[in-house]
Amino acid sequence: MRAADVIQAIGRGFNPDKTYTFFDDDLIMLEIIDLSQTASTSKELLRLKGRIIGKGGKTREIIESLIGVKMSVYGKTVSAIGHPDQILIVRTAMDMLISGATHGAVYSFLEKKKQDLMRSQLDSY
């Protein structure tokens, strides 16, 4: 991860101390999803952020723990830090939540993708 990405990640709400640890891995990337492009009103933006965060942060925590990324919901954006294959999964999960998919369907998708990630990691050895 480049210095510019680390600075941008801090600006998107990530903890600076934890973000600096990403300097070590060149494959780590930052993905920023702008919710204002989807939400037409501030009320809809709040609803989307609520769906992504979940009750008590549950949905965000599930995504982070299953896929192994770090996420931040800040302002009008959702940001994720991870490897490209992880980011692709998070992006799809965010699109599902934004489109109105049930949380259960998103969790099932994430469980399946976690198994796929584990399989691909085992295959690479």
Task: Give the role of each language-model region.
Residues M1-Y125:
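RNA-contacting regions in translation and RNA-metabolism proteins
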